[in-house]
A protein has these predicted regions:
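Phosphate/diphosphate ligand-binding glycine-rich loop within oxidoreductases
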Residues: 36-144, 267
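Phosphate-coordination loops involved in phosphoryl transfer and adenosine-cofactor binding
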Residues: 42-47, 154-158, 256
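A short helix->loop->beta-strand "cap" motif at the edges of active sites that frequently abuts
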Residues: 123, 181-183, 252-258
């Protein structure tokens, strides 16, 4: 059983914890595919979704996951809350805790914000993305999708291409995949590669062709213009021509390879429309995996809370 109150990142998660989450998520996904969307496990619980950044997939996915498990949900947008009046994250957390929330699901532009909140509250805190730091549930849903397709993570060759420097997804994927025994290759323009990423277990490649060759999974990452200054690459068109994944590049991957992207996708930039719409694409399946993974996490964290350990 997972022995933690919160899910803040995969940097400190064990392989055993990740595997337990994926096992539980696989069961949740089977139920969803059967049309079962009402479970009693979190009856009487309340989950507050506290987002300081915009989101469609993650916010909706967490809300559905909580409701499918029987919990009540509250959505708080920072722009329309007391945060807009200057309330600090710590004080917001204390307020939500005083209302006896069971879960606080937070997305924040500052790296480390979920850790600060978790130290303040009794509720379980789930990191839905903190700055350029981590996005653990996205990595878990990525691994859930991979494992469903290949039956394992160990030994898989995963190519990650795109804006690695500004991507919290890339870091969480790297932590999780390497802990479960996958080989991770990365490629991006030099201006979009963070210093030291190779020391975390990634193999940096000199070309997109080198990264994709023989890969079981080809993952594109969104160019995050909102987190960077101009000048990291000449233009989106030139990025697509020299760094994006098209059908010719994809043909270098394993014959059974799948294509993934955390979304939202810039069609024709990170991936061409032909690649996105190819039968190898698992982008829509990732969305369903996201609901299943978040259902699993809420369930497992509540089990630990109930144990009183």
């Amino acid at each position: 059983m997972i022995k933690r109150k919160d899910m803040l990142g995969l940097i400190d998660a064990t392989a055993e914890e990740i595997s337990e989450i994926l096992d539980t998520a696989a069961n949740m996904k089977k139920l969803l595919k059967q049309g079962i969307k009402k479970l009693p496990h979190l009856g009487g619980c309340t989950a507050t979704i506290l987002f300081y950044e915009n989101s469609t997939r993650t916010r909706t996915s967490f809300e559905l996951a909580a409701k499918y498990m029987g919990a009540s949900t509250i959505n708080i947008a920072a722009s329309s809350s007391s945060v807009a009046k200057g309330e600090t994250l710590v004080d917001t957390g204390k307020t939500l805790d005083a209302m006896k929330n069971d879960f606080i699901i937070i997305r924040h532009p500052m790296g480390g914000a979920p850790y600060l909140l978790a130290k303040t509250v009794k509720a379980s805190v789930l990191n839905a993305g903190d700055g350029m730091n981590e996005h653990p549930t996205q990595a878990l849903l990525d691994m859930c999708t991979m494992r469903e397709r290949f039956g394992k993570i160990e030994g898989l060759k995963v190519a990650i291409l795109g804006d690695i420097k500004h991507s919290r997804v890339a870091k969480s994927d790297l932590f999780g995949l390497t802990k479960l025994g996958a080989e991770v290759k990365m490629f991006a323009p030099e201006t979009l590669i963070p210093k030291g990423i190779d020391r975390l277990g990634a193999k940096l490649c000199a070309s997109r062709e080198e990264a994709v060759e023989g890969a079981d999974v080809v993952m594109g990452l969104r160019i995050q213009l909102e987190r960077q200054q101009a000048g990291n690459f000449p233009s989106l068109n030139e990025y697509a021509e020299f760094y994006g994944v098209n059908e010719k590049v994809l043909s270098l991957a394993s014959p059974d390879a799948i294509v993934m992207h955390p979304g939202p996708v810039n069609r024709g930039v990170e991936l061409t429309s032909a690649v996105i719409d190819d039968g190898k694409s698992r982008i829509e399946d990732q969305v369903l995996s996201g609901v299943a993974v978040r259902m699993a996490l809420l369930f497992l964290l509540e089990q630990f809370r109930k144990s009183g350990k």
